[in-house]
Amino acid sequence: MVISPSKKQAARRHTHSVKIGNLYVGSEHSIKMQSMTTTPTADVEATVTQICALVEAKCEIARVTVQGIKEAQACEHIKERLLSMGIAIPLVADIHFFPQAAMHVADFVDKVRINPGNFVDKRNMFTGKTYTDKNYADSLLRLEEKFTPLVEKCKRLGKAMRIGVNHGSLSERVMQRYGDTIEGMVVSALEYIEVCEKLGYRDVVFSMKSSNPKVMVAAYRQLAKDLDARGWHYPLHLGVTEAGIGLDGIIKSAVGIGTLLTEGLGDTIRCSLTGCPTTEIPVCESLLKHTTTYLDLPKKENPFALENSETFVNASKKITKATPWGSVYGVFIKLMKEHLLNNTVEKLLEQLGINPTNGKKDFTAPDGIIVPKSFIGTSVIEKLKEHLLVFHHHEVPCLYNHNEEIWNSEQVLSAPFVHCHATPPFIHSTREFFEKKQSNEQPVKLVFSKDLDDEFEAAVSIATEFGALLLDGLGEAVILDLPNVSLPTVREIAFSTLQSAGVRLVKTEYISCPGCGRTLFDLPEVTTRIREKTKHLVGLKIAVMGCIVNGPGEMADSDFGFVGSKTGMIDLYVKHTCVKAHIPMEDAEEELVRLLQEHGVWKDPE
């Protein structure tokens, strides 16, 4: 992260400008929003129609899948149709496994995306093959030989390129030497850019995607560091691959992309959500709105104040002693007086995920609640105390911003919690706070509040600001104050943020691709059905992937996979291994359940 001495905040990483069609990306230009079509690319009219819808939604770059020469030729007609309609949105071709398609389509599109894991080398098939130093060196020579024609053609035509590394599809050669590590991802990217540099071609953008936000953030940080150390200031395209469906997908994207944006990294972004591609753009817009604030703060810092506050979120550097709630990362929800006056205890318990009859808690039931002080001692609160920890909102001080005097005050050092109001430069000042306090023997628990009314905006903002700290281990609990959002949704936002940051697993996790022209079934519908069947299997990771091109690789972190193999057929995976092939679609979901039973991870829903 680059810290501006005058503002103590992130500054946007310097990147050179890359021309993509009629626009430029780089630090001198606005951060661009992009998406990808889900129509078969060979269906020119359907693809053009979907791109027009993306343009209407304010998408700035459109990508299409190009799996062969037929699709490459279709791109010529797609581009012609768009231009005839006065639509000049840059068109990007997505290439996997087939360099000839890249060479052909470069004539028609504005940018070519290649995956270093499968452009020249074979995708890792976990065969255990060993590469000697000579084998490895020979492979690099072959890479340069095969990759050079595309680089030379793009340079000659003035076309851009994205070197798009995916954590789940590193080549066999890289995996054998480095494993599926951050180092392996960075090496995979650098091998290709070294060829570009040798040929004097710099119209290149990088991406370092993973379905795991923790891996994704670490990979981008490391690549940016390594590129800058070489004096190579290439732009970055940000994305959490196969983020998923609905609020879970939005939150996972926001944790990864939002964290990096607040650090000044990123020149283009995409939120890979399962469903209609136009739904991705509002999420991108919201992310840019919430994170740009961190890069555009006034030079005069906000006045410091230490006051009482009504809500808090604990963000301590590390757990140094047992927390009152017993969980490493607790979840607390602020209840308004309206919640307490207008609902029965039974209704409140249901909304908080607790069975009022037997007291059984849902996996996403909070650890406690924050209530107005005037309600302490009432019969309602006493009944809620039987199931939850209860705090009132005057028990801890509130830190609206940080300076040395406040950091070292007895009021902060001795408080059980310290509220920190989550307004920019909240993320950066919080990190600085912990850097100064981590050597102090007395644990300081810093907590922060967020008060938002809109469900969608709340999810993006909380996932970005809380997630950015949680990813780096700065946090012990989250407490949300969302009076106009339903309590079940507040719980979902809180626990999805913790799960996406990898600090508390309370739900089944789904890795589902957004779909593209290769998709072989209705992804949103099937993903929703599988979620309903398996959502009670806490801690399990299930991938739902539209095709076998990216599916087996992109579901690297999953325990089980449901992958389209051909039209109307599904393959089922355990980790990286296909264990059941070509299952008719109508039987596949039940076969997945049977597979889970065979591996002893299935249990009937309660």
Curated annotation (Swiss-Prot):
One GO term (biological process): isopentenyl diphosphate biosynthetic process, methylerythritol 4-phosphate pathway
Gene Ontology molecular function: any one: 4 iron, 4 sulfur cluster binding
Cofactor(s) listed in the protein's UniProt record: [4Fe-4S] cluster
Name of the encoding gene: ispG
Chain positions recorded as [4Fe-4S] cluster binding sites: C513, C516, C547, E554
Species for this entry: Chlamydia caviae (strain ATCC VR-813 / DSM 19441 / 03DC25 / GPIC) (Chlamydophila caviae)
Cofactor binding notes: Binds 1 [4Fe-4S] cluster.
Keyword flag Endoplasmic reticulum: no
InterPro entries the record matches: Dihydropteroate_synth-like_sf (IPR011005), IspG_atypical (IPR017178), IspG_bac-typ (IPR004588), NO2/SO3_Rdtase_4Fe4S_sf (IPR045854)
UniProt-recorded name of the protein: 4-hydroxy-3-methylbut-2-en-1-yl diphosphate synthase (flavodoxin)
Disulfide bridge map: none
Catalytic activity, EC: 1.17.7.3
Gene3D superfamilies assigned to the protein according to its UniProt record, in alphabetical order: Dihydropteroate synthase-like, Sulfite Reductase Hemoprotein, domain 1
Job description of the protein: Converts 2C-methyl-D-erythritol 2,4-cyclodiphosphate (ME-2,4cPP) into 1-hydroxy-2-methyl-2-(E)-butenyl 4-diphosphate.
Highest taxon above the source species: Bacteria
Pathway terms, separated by semicolons: Isoprenoid biosynthesis; isopentenyl diphosphate biosynthesis via DXP pathway; isopentenyl diphosphate from 1-deoxy-D-xylulose 5-phosphate: step 5/6
